[in-house]
């Protein structure tokens, strides 16, 4: 009986210690603390990283996903070419902005790591990072607007269904053109 009580005590202490651990534990080894390796890769590749969810989830498809679904959406050759061009332009615009964001986050991280950060430097760095994040988000969102102008109403509905966004809400089915 004493062995069972000891085992229960050990388990209780272990679970308490595990619960006390920060959700950030393990992140201290990142090269840039604020960005995961996946986020860095996505920024380098010009990927959206959910930055255009306001558009995507409100009926404005993104060019990449439209291209992925081009056969099921029955895009015409002209539509496909226009959307391919949008996608390439978006990626070409977003990639250097993403690289800039990586550099800015790295510089901020270094200042904290070197303990050289000041209030003024912090304000300047975070302002620049915020501006760059806004540029990056805009670089993705605006291509959702343009993509919606290319698709027909039935293709917009089909896209929403294929992506799992279809709803009976009348607001979902109005034309975005």
Describe each PLM feature range.
Residues 13-17:
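N-terminal signal peptide c-region/cleavage motif recognized by signal peptidases
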Residues 1-8:
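Bacterial N-terminal signal peptides that target proteins for export
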Residues 8-10, 66:
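Extended aliphatic helical segments
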Residues 21-177:
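Charge-rich (acidic/polar
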